């Protein structure tokens, strides 16, 4: 006989109307206040059903809630069905119903859905951000098996899709979330996406754009200049740029051996486009060691910009701050499941990617509107641990519902404050 020394005599899972997601009421109430379901009603589907029990809007809303709460597996649909809190105010469908929902998705569906996602972001940015900073980034979503439009991406040395992401830096919001085929080059579609953004954003010459070397394109420079956008884009390691930078250091009598990675040399020079047009190359340079020996040629890191006001160091520091936006992309992929697309058909995967994108934007609008101080910087997974995962008992009596939270919850004061802010919207 196995001898045990347990602290408890028995355990069971028959506690009654208990939920571990008591804090989900914050986001659920917020979505109700902004009338999200009404916005989703306008999305078209290829729907030939007669008198369906679950509308497409209802099913889509459930998937958004699932994504926000961090339930990303197909089997997690059962959690929504069985949870006494999550199933309280709406009829939850089965996983089979969700699977059939994706069969009704078309290209028209995803196009209209994307418009809703971006319009929410535009409205927030236009209202709350005076000087928008747009950060463009291409990323990868790994695929498995024979998924439609997947291809080998040499940069990542894996098969997958190649999404294009454009964030607004201050708000973290996605202004563009484009799932592209695996064969798409890093900057494919950037001008088309920016055209849509610039028709919606308030542009008084205050918009700035940042991108890595994948966006080093002359047609993009010209397009941004024509739209009065200040840009900062990484220059590819052309030998000509390295040579010009070294010559500039020689002219200024700067010895790159006196500068290292932590304290580099900052310099600049201009390139002539035509008789009236110039662009500015800002660079930093420092010596390299290999095998204890100094290299003859310094490491040179360049950006191109049409900003002639910032000092070289200020311009370079401003560009390098875009590294934070790469963390926003990681949050989309890791915390909102945007990095896992499991359908065989591309349009279904695009729908899933857009659901993740909308959930990401909804959280960050909620974060900037409701949360305070340090909570305005936490990622979604941290928020879930801090404010969502709270034990609660659901008590229904005389047509009233009472939620009785755990008395041991340590953030009760802050939670109550946030709850009252949501109710006042």
Task: Name what the model sees in each region.
Residues 1-200, 224, 367, 390-425:
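Dynamic "connector" segments at or just before major functional cores
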Residues 2-7, 230-334, 414, 420-425:
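An anionic, glycine-rich sequence signature occurring as long contiguous blocks
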Residues 18, 49-58, 294, 343-353:
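Structural motif
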Residues 30, 77, 140, 312-351, ...:
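Short amphipathic alpha-helical "interface-anchor" segments enriched in bulky aromatics
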Residues 137, 206-215:
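Acidic/histidine-rich, metal-coordinating catalytic segments
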Residues 139-141, 171, 180-182, 238, ...:
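Short, glycine-/Ser/Thr-/acidic-enriched flexible segments
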Residues 202, 221-230:
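Short, surface-exposed basic-aromatic patches at helix termini and helix-loop junctions that form
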Residues 339-400:
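Basic, amphipathic alpha-helical segments enriched in Lys/Arg and hydrophobic/aromatic residues
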């Amino acid at each position: 006989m196995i001898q045990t020394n347990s602290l408890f005599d028995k355990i069971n899972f028959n506690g009654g109307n208990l939920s571990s997601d008591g804090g989900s009421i914050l986001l659920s109430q917020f979505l109700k206040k902004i009338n999200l379901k009404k916005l989703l009603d306008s999305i078209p589907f290829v729907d030939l059903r007669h008198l369906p029990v679950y509308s497409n809007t209802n099913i889509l809303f459930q998937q958004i809630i699932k994504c926000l709460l961090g339930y990303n597996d197909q089997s997690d649909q059962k959690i929504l069905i069985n949870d006494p809190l999550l199933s309280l105010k709406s009829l939850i469908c089965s996983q089979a119903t969700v699977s059939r929902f994706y069969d009704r998705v078309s290209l028209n569906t995803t196009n209209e859905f994307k418009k809703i996602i971006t319009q929410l972001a535009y409205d927030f940015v236009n209202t709350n951000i005076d000087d928008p900073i747009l950060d463009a980034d291409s990323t990868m979503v790994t695929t498995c098996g024979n998924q439609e439009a997947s291809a080998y991406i040499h940069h990542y040395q894996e098969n997958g899709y190649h999404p294009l992401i454009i964030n607004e830096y201050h708000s973290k919001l996605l202004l563009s979330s484009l799932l592209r085929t695996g064969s798409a080059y890093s900057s494919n579609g950037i001008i088309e996406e920016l055209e849509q953004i610039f028709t919606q954003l308030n542009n008084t010459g205050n918009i700035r754009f940042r991108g890595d070397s994948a966006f080093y394109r002359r047609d993009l420079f010209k397009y941004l200049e024509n739209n009065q956008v200040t840009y900062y884009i990484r220059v590819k390691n052309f030998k000509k740029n390295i040579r010009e930078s070294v010559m500039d250091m020689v002219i200024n009598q700067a010895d790159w051996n006196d500068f290292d990675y932590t304290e580099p040399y900052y310099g600049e020079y201009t390139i002539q486009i035509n008789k009236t047009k110039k662009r500015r190359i800002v660079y930093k340079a420092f010596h390299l060691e290999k095998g204890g020996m100094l290299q003859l040629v310094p490491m040179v890191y360049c950006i191109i910009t049409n900003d002639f006001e910032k000092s070289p160091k200020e311009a370079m520091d401003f560009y390098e701050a875009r590294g934070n936006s790469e963390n926003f992309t990681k949050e989309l992929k890791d915390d909102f499941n945007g990095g896992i697309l499991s359908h065989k058909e591309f349009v279904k995967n695009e729908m899933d990617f857009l659901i993740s994108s909308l959930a990401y934007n909804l959280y960050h609008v909620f974060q900037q509107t409701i949360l305070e101080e340090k909570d305005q910087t936490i990622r979604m997974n941290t928020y879930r641990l801090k404010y969502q995962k709270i034990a609660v008992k659901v008590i229904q009596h005389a047509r009233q519902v009472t939620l009785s939270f755990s008395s041991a919850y340590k953030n009760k004061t802050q939670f109550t404050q946030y709850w009252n802010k949501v109710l006042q919207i």
